[in-house]
């Protein structure tokens, strides 16, 4: 009797300790979630691709599924296609992907997050599959870049981008409103972008059987080193001093409002949808930046990786694929200890370090636990 009881208890404990009931982890998104489409991940590179870990890898560990691998492969510097040898791979995220790819050429390629979701939706979802989705950051960067370029092209690129998601009447009304109207239209564009993603998730995931969907909202891109450098350049070109600082702050406030418009609309679309959890990445990143020591961080503004050049505006550029743990160890700042880069928030000027990715993984895993999805 005691023997049988012990065996039964052991069986129960084993079942409880096995962790998750998740059957598959599927991913769509941009560089933040890319499992290695281009042969590297968008963070500090480990000794191997498998040892280079981003947040989706931490989620895969937590839900006890096989390591993620990229479904697509690079066929050129800016071209991606399905990899016939990777039909079993479930990570469809691609570095550089957008929800709305400017123009039409990329709309049916994996550089479109909507196309990634269509590709994933070609196979029905199981009841215990988890879908992770992240996007909007590159779209926000495109919108900000076009807006800032208005002084050079008279606003042509910005108006053209607005016209991809807004009606001709909305664009005309924005143009008639001058600078204020055009700035306000950016928020309408980002809200429409959220609708694009929500509609595609509805049609290609929820309608295909997905019951556990986690969507990260967009981070405040103005807090990244890329945009801090851009805003500093704006301040300088606007005369510097208080005048330049005020202009830079005005642009940052406008851009932040655009991202918030996207996030608010995304939250609204899924507020009553029990199958979708929207994770507040925007709020979490700002919390990490506001209280870095709480999260084991010290540097919130500078990239850990060295700049490798400059762009046409004279701003620093980075080569994330050559930024390795070995190279950073060899070029450690004075007094820095082993793995010093993990006290930084950013690896290059737009992407997180392994430590930041671990925090992102924790954020998502907490959401999965709260929903009872793991």
Give residue spans per PLM region:
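C-terminal motif of bacterial Sec signal peptides marking the signal peptidase cleavage site
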Residues: 12-15
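Acidic, Ser/Thr- and Pro-rich low-complexity intrinsically disordered regions characteristic
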Residues: 8-9
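Conserved active-site regions of diverse hydrolases
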Residues: 17-374
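Bacterial N-terminal signal peptides that target proteins for export
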Residues: 1-5
């Amino acid at each position: 009797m005691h023997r049988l009881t012990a065996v039964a208890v052991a069986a129960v404990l084993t079942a409880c300790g096995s962790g998750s009931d998740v059957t598959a982890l599927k991913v769509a998104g941009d560089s933040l979630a890319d499992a290695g489409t281009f042969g590297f991940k968008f963070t500090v590179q480990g000794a191997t691709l498998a040892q280079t870990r981003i947040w989706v890898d931490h989620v895969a560990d937590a839900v006890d599924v096989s390591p993620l691998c990229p479904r697509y492969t690079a066929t050129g510097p800016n071209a991606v296609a399905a990899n016939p040898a990777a039909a079993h791979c479930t990570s469809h995220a691609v570095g550089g992907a957008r929800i709305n790819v400017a123009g039409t050429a990329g709309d049916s390629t994996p550089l479109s997050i909507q196309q990634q979701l269509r590709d994933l939706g070609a196979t029905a979802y199981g009841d215990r599959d988890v879908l992770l989705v992240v996007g909007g950051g590159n779209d926000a960067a495109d919108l900000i870049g076009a807006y800032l370029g208005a002084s050079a092209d008279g606003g042509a690129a910005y108006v053209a981008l607005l016209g991809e998601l807004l009606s001709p009447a909305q664009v005309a009304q924005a143009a008639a409103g001058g600078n204020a109207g055009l700035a306000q239209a950016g928020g309408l564009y980002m809200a429409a972008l959220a609708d694009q993603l929500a509609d595609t998730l509805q049609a290609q995931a929820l309608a295909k059987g997905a019951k556990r969907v986690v969507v990260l909202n967009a981070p405040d891109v103005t807090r990244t080193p890329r945009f801090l450098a851009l805003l500093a350049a704006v301040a300088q070109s606007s005369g510097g001093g208080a005048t330049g600082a005020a202009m830079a702050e005005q642009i940052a406030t406008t851009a932040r409002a655009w991202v918030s418009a996207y996030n608010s609309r995304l939250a609204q679309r899924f507020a009553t949808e029990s199958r979708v959890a929207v994770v507040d990445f925007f709020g979490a990143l700002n919390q990490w930046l506001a209280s870095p020591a709480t999260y084991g961080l010290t540097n919130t503004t500078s990239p850990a990786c060295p700049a490798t050049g400059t762009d046409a505006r004279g701003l620093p550029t980075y080569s994330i694929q050559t930024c390795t743990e070995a190279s950073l160890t060899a070029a450690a700042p004075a007094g820095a200890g082993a793995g010093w880069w993990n006290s930084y928030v950013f690896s290059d000027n737009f992407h997180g370090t392994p430590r930041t990715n671990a925090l992102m993984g924790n954020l998502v895993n907490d959401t999965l636990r709260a929903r009872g999805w793991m």
